[in-house]
UniProtKB/Swiss-Prot annotation:
Protein family (similarity comment): Belongs to the universal ribosomal protein uS4 family.
Organism the protein comes from: Malacoplasma penetrans (strain HF-2)
Gene Ontology MF, one: rRNA binding
Primary gene name: rpsD
Name of the protein this chain belongs to: Small ribosomal subunit protein uS4
Gene Ontology biological-process annotations: ribosomal small subunit biogenesis; translation
Amino acid sequence: MSRYLGSITKKSRRYGFSLLETEREFIKGKKRTYAPGQHGNKRVKLSGYGEQLQEKQKMMYLYGLNDRQFRRTFVIAKHMKGALTLNTFIALESRLDNLVYRMGFAPTRRAARQLVNHGHILLDGKKVTIPSCMVKLEQTIEVAPKSKDLPIVAAGASNTPCKFVDSDLKTKKGKYVRFPERDELPEGINEAYVVEWFNRLV
């Protein structure tokens, strides 16, 4: 399955969950805030399998991954010490593209991935073009000097950097200082269902 490149707003409505983490998709006055489709405003009771699949899909779309990438990230989480439920989130949050977004250097994860792909991001002073690169604690991330004035970078300044990163929005340089705690991560996802889903496959 390839990475989803369609409307994030539609997917947010489908799952009743803000994939942009801003609730912008559900602002009063929007044409539709319920799920897309002819019967989108009708709730359907899901089976246990359906609930697991839905939570997996929500997390996958939130971080902008395809199935293969998500499964690979889950395998990384399984080899980490601690609770697998939290480690699944930590592995996702430790991706380079996600941390570029968390530091306020890009307005969305999709934009952050684009910056990494095009060589605008440095990791410990070296250009890295792999969005899935797993960043270690205390590593530094910065926008390349020639890229700091890009509109897409300026747009990221509206994001408040998370507490688990040390970010300077003026110099466009930051550090991954600690792993996030559960209350610092997106609400509305049952990660236990995600773990149950992948445990059947991995």
